[in-house]
């Protein structure tokens, strides 16, 4: 960036003691504990086959239905009800099974396309293309409030590359801040 651009960035990033800044709205809870706010991201971590996808399905079902699902509660504003669910590891058949599970948990019919849930299977794409697809989907989806990414490591060519990891996390921070969404 040029010096002029840096000056603009500094101005944009300045925090003043006299300004009023709104607290990020809580949108995801487990019981009464906040686990997600708009403008931020969270993660489910665990060993392979430790039911992370099932756990995330319950989060998606709660956000989709507005009800408590397996102790998860969600409170997305009216203009933030759209969910984008991205799976980087599984093919379309498996993703469809996850989609049906989410709909069952949300007590919604699994023979009708849900209005507020978009699922993408990105297994066949290269890591860089996956990231670009997600960026485009986030940018063009109106009323987006929640983005679930199952398989964040698949955005990286080298899981041990700190520069690649920093680049992906920086994108997440940019998207959550610019779009005021929650990424999980």
What are these regions (language model features)?
Residues 1-3, 140-141:
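C-terminal regions of RecA-like/P-loop NTPase motor modules
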Residues 27-28, 117-119, 183:
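Hydrophobic beta-strand residues in large extracellular and virion-surface proteins
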Residues 44, 148-150, 180-184:
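Structural recognition of the conserved hydrophobic beta-strand(s) that form the central parallel beta-sheet
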Residues 54, 163-166:
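Conserved structured core elements
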Residues 77-160, 167, 174:
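Conserved inter-motif catalytic segment of the P-loop NTP-binding fold
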Residues 166-184:
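Substrate-engagement module of ASCE P-loop NTPases
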């Amino acid at each position: 960036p040029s010096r002029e651009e840096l000056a603009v960035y500094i101005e944009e990033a300045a925090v003043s003691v006299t300004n009023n800044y709104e607290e990020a709205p809580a949108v995801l809870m487990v019981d009464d504990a906040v686990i997600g706010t708009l403008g931020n991201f969270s993660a489910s971590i665990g060993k392979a086959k430790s039911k992370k996808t099932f756990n995330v399905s319950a989060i998606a079902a709660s956000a989709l239905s507005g009800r408590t699902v397996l102790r998860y509660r969600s409170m997305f504003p009216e203009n933030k009800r759209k969910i984008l669910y991205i799976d980087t590891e599984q093919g379309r058949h498996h993703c469809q099974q996850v989609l049906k599970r989410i709909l069952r948990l949300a007590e919604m019919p699994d023979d009708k396309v849900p209005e507020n849930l978009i699922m993408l299977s990105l297994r066949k794409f290269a890591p860089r293309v996956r990231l670009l697809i997600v960026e485009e989907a986030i940018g063009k989806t109106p009323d987006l409030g929640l983005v679930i990414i199952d398989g964040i490591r698949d955005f990286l060519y080298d899981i041990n590359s700190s520069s690649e990891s920093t680049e992906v996390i920086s994108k997440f921070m940019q998207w959550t801040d610019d779009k005021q969404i929650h990424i999980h």
